A protein has these predicted regions:
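Beta-strand-rich domains and repeat architectures in extracellular enzymes and scaffolds
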Residues: 24-56
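Surface loop/turn motifs at the tips and blade-to-blade linkers of beta-strand repeat domains
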Residues: 26, 70-75
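Recurrent small/Gly-Pro-centered beta-turn motifs in extracellular repeat architectures
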Residues: 47, 93-94, 174-175
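Short glycine/acidic-enriched loop and turn motifs that connect beta-strands
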Residues: 49-53, 96-99, 178-182
Length: 223
């Protein structure tokens, strides 16, 4: 079963048109978090606003003459950025709270790097899990510490898993989350523990390769 995610192939409508020219007042660059692409052509700059009650971060990409805001929604923490080997995509690994993280995806366009999806890629992966039979086996849906993260092996096209997939085609995403389950000791229970799926950068679809089926069945705590 696969799930087509709208807006994951082309850039979301209006993303480029609404681009600001520079960080707003109050945002200052935190140079220790600056990241460069492997070829040095793209620089990701992270700007912090300390004037708000909760510190806010913005992420900007410099490439040639383009200086683009990667996401209009500010973040609460700095982030890590990973480039695909062909440099056409960037994955942002974003902490969103204690023990909680998600993923965002950006695509290279003539206007620079822009959002590939309206929702975070991590949220889309959770949406996909909810369409699967494994979700219906859960004793309880995750209540906190819900995280989406990349499976190791991204930079070598996951050949360590014994697969021979096309280069720069897939992202493997793992999901984890906890819930308080009455009768369990302790109540805090990892109800999703590294459930994995694959995202196709070319088609914008999720699927579960057969080699993950067995482990995925064990990654959810059943009733």
């Amino acid at each position: 079963m696969s799930l087509l995610i709208a807006c994951s192939i082309g850039v979301c409508n209006g993303a480029a048109a609404s681009q600001p020219a520079a960080p707003p007042a109050g945002y200052k660059i935190e140079e220790k978090y600056t990241r460069k692409s492997p070829d040095g052509a793209t620089t990701i700059e992270q700007y912090l606003n300390k004037d708000t009650d909760d510190w806010k971060w913005q992420f900007w990409a410099r490439r040639q003459d383009a200086f683009t805001l990667l996401d209009p929604e500010p973040a609460g923490y700095p982030a890590d950025f990973i480039f695909t080997n062909d440099l056409k995509w960037i994955v942002r690994v974003q902490k969103i709270g204690s023990g909680t993280s998600t993923l965002h995806l950006y695509r290279l366009t003539p206007q620079g790097y822009l959002r590939a999806n309206r929702k975070p890629l991590g949220d889309l992966a959770w949406d996909y899990l909810k369409t699967r039979r494994d979700w219906r086996k859960l004793v309880k849906a995750p209540e906190y510490h819900d995280s989406a993260y990349l499976v190791d092996g991204f930079d070598e096209n996951y050949r360590g898993l014994g697969v021979d997939w096309p280069a720069n085609r897939y992202l493997l995403i793992a999901l984890s989350g906890d819930a308080d389950v009455r009768g369990r000791k302790p109540m805090q229970t990892g109800v999703v523990n590294g459930w994995r799926c694959r995202y196709d950068l070319q088609t914008g679809k999720f699927d579960v390769p057969a080699l993950f089926s067995g482990d995925n069945a064990k990654a959810v705590v059943p009733e």
